[in-house]
Every structure is written in C-alpha cells, then in structure tokens.
C-alpha cells in the first residue's frame, strides 16, 4: 500500500505544468530574497538602536560600531534587490510573451512598472552602501551634539525600520500565499486559497511610509549637522548624509511606482502569484 502511494504521489508531481514549474522557481528565488531582506532589517534596526542608546547616554566600553551593522544591512539589501530585480524582469518577460500570443486579456503595465522600480531599488541600496562605508571611515559619533530634537529624529528612524520589517513580512506572506495558489491547482484538498494581492498591497504601502520617514530623518540629520554641529564635527560627515537623502528620494520614487502597480494588480481581482517588491 505504501509503495502504491509513493507512485501516485510522484505522478502528481509530474502533473505540474512547465509554466507553473517556472513560476515556482521564481517564487523560490523571491522567497530567498525576502529572507535576506528580513535579515538586513535586523542589522538596520540594531544600527538605529545603538545610535539611540548612545544619544540617550547608555554607553558601554564594549559598544559595537553601529556603522558595521549599517554596512552589513546595506550589503544584504543590495543582494536581495538584485535577486528581486531578476524575478521581476523574468516574470514580466514571461507575461509579456503571453500577451503577445494573445493568451491574456489584461494590461501588463503593472508588471513592467514593478520591474522598473526594482532597478531603482538596486540604485538605492548601492548609494546607501557607499554612504555607509564613508560613514564608517569618517565618523566619530561622540562628536555629534545631542539635543532633544536629535533624539526624536533617532526614535523616528527606529520606528521606520520597524515599519520596514512589517513591509517585508507582508511580502513574505504574499509570497507564501502565491506558492499556495500554484500548489492548490494540483491539490484538491486545498479549497480556500488566500489572495496574495492584499498582503502585497499592504507591504507596498508600508515601504512607501518607511521611505518617507527615512527621507525626513536624513534631512533632519543633515540640518542638525550643519546648524548644530558645524563647529565640532568634520565637514566630510555631511557628504555621506547627502547620499542618504539622494537614496531616500530614489526610494520614494521606486516605492511610489511599485505601489501604483500593486494597486492596479489588486483591481484586476484575479488570483495570480505576486512577483517583485
């Protein structure tokens, strides 16, 4: 009986169409990318937390260099963004090919927009990485004048990274539900499959909120350095912060494009896997 069950189980696996096998392959890459993003979120959060604790006077002789966490987070986020870009462009090419063959009856513009926004994300984290490395080379955080406004800005930054984590978690849910959507076609026992459009849309909204907050933070840090710390801090510290402002502007553009795309996908009201971020 066990031998027959195994044969039947293998036969079911072979029934997965070539198109769905390609979709599952892309979803696997996307899942790995999101796990890398979530790991990067931990580094970003620790970076922000150490800064806040130092500003509040909780200093330790063995305090780690916060910029090491920032660099590690940027490296991981850059790797994840490259993987997501590969997934987004491959998914767009596949659906565009089907559109040319007359197999679909809806616009492929949202998929194209998501693919384009993925390039902005690569640029964003590349610029952030350059800024983080320059920060590591040049900055002694003890020279920054701590004011109540400075602490508020650091608290906002910490909240922004919490929102980022929730956004990545939402896309993790969307990706897992996309797996269920495909696997459910070959498993009759799964009758109630969730629509991945909803967590994807929530995640896209959270990313935009996070990036707006980080732009505000980077601008406030720049103003603080110029107005409050100009006489005590190396002027070269301002340069990495200019890069942070530029990167966050690019991030807002990318997240706005992808949010609009996910809104259009949600309006289709069709159960399809979610690709991109």
What is each of the regions a protein language model found here?
Residues 1-246, 260-277:
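Glycine-rich, hydrophobic membrane-spanning regions of integral membrane proteins that mediate transport
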Residues 210, 250-257:
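Alpha-helical membrane-embedded segments
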């Amino acid at each position: 009986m066990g031998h027959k069950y195994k044969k039947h189980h293998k036969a079911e696996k072979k029934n997965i169409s070539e198109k769905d096998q390609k979709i599952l392959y892309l979803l696997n890459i996307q899942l790995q990318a999101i796990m890398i993003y979530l790991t990067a979120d931990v580094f970003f959060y620790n970076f922000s937390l150490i800064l806040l604790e130092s500003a509040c006077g909780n200093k330790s002789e063995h305090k780690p260099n916060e910029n090491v966490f920032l660099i590690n987070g940027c490296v991981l986020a850059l790797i994840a963004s490259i993987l997501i870009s590969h997934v987004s462009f491959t998914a767009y090419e596949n659906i565009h090919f089907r559109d040319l063959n007359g197999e679909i009856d809806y616009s492929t513009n949202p998929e194209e927009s998501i693919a384009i926004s993925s390039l902005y994300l690569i640029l964003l984290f590349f610029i952030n990485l350059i800024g983080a490395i320059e920060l590591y080379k040049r900055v002694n955080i003890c020279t920054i004048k701590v004011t109540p406004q400075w602490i508020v800005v650091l608290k906002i930054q910490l909240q922004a990274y919490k929102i980022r984590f929730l956004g990545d978690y939402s896309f993790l849910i969307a990706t897992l539900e996309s797996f269920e959507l495909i696997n459910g076609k070959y498993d009759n026992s799964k009758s109630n499959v969730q629509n991945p459009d909803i967590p994807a849309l929530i995640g896209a909204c959270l990313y935009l909120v996070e990036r707006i907050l980080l732009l505000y933070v980077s601008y406030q840090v720049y103003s603080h350095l110029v107005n409050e710390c100009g006489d005590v801090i190396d002027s070269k510290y301002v340069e990495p912060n200019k890069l942070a402002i530029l990167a966050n502007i690019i991030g807002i553009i990318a997240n706005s494009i992808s949010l609009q795309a996910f809104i259009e996908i949600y309006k289709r009201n069709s159960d399809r896997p979610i690709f991109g971020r």
